[in-house]
């Protein structure tokens, strides 16, 4: 049961021709060729860069919301927020 010889492929081709008929096989091969051509055309269109790109929409300004736990530099953090209850400058 090694590789398939040429005679195996000939027998398979004859069986396919008997099952599907000559007309269906040629139609199928034509459809495959059309699909390959359409694929190549699509790939060629993707390679060409677009001539004019649309401007990106203007960005909305970012709003920041300060947290209630933020402190300004030089202020102490409440003892309830520190482990051990110590007060340390920030």
Curated annotation (Swiss-Prot):
Stored InterPro entries:
TatA/B/E, TatA/E
Instruction: List GO terms (cellular component aspect).
Output: TAT protein transport complex
What is the name of the protein in this document?
Answer: Sec-independent protein translocase protein TatA
- Function summary: Part of the twin-arginine translocation (Tat) system that transports large folded proteins containing a characteristic twin-arginine motif in their signal peptide across membranes. TatA could form the protein-conducting channel of the Tat system.
- Whom does it interact with, and what assembly results? The Tat system comprises two distinct complexes: a TatABC complex, containing multiple copies of TatA, TatB and TatC subunits, and a separate TatA complex, containing only TatA subunits. Substrates initially bind to the TatABC complex, which probably triggers association of the separate TatA complex to form the active translocon.
Per the UniProt record, the source organism is Methylobacterium radiotolerans (strain ATCC 27329 / DSM 1819 / JCM 2831 / NBRC 15690 / NCIMB 10815 / 0-1)
Q: Its membrane topology, per UniProt?
A: Single-pass membrane protein
Q: Which family does it belong to?
A: Belongs to the TatA/E family.
Q: Which GO terms describe its biological process?
A: protein transport by the Tat complex
For this protein, the record's HAMAP family field holds: TatA_E
Q: Which gene encodes it?
A: tatA
Q: Where in the cell is it found?
A: Cell inner membrane
Q: Which Gene3D superfamilies match?
A: 1.20.5.3310
Q: What is its main location?
A: membrane
- Keyword Cell membrane listed? The answer is yes
Q: Which residues cross the membrane?
A: 1-21
Q: Where is this region: Disordered?
A: 44-90
The protein's GO terms of the molecular function aspect are:
protein transmembrane transporter activity
> Where are the disulfide bridges?
none
């Amino acid at each position: 049961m090694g590789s398939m010889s040429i005679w195996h492929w000939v027998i398979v081709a004859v069986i396919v021709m008997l099952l599907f008929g000559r007309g269906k096989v040629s139609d199928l091969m034509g459809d495959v060729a059309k699909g390959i051509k359409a694929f190549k055309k699509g790939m060629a269109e993707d390679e060409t860069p677009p001539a004019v790109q649309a401007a990106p929409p203007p960005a909305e300004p970012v709003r920041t919301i300060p947290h209630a736990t933020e402190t300004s530099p030089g202020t102490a953090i409440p003892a309830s927020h520190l482990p051990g209850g110590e007060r340390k400058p920030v």
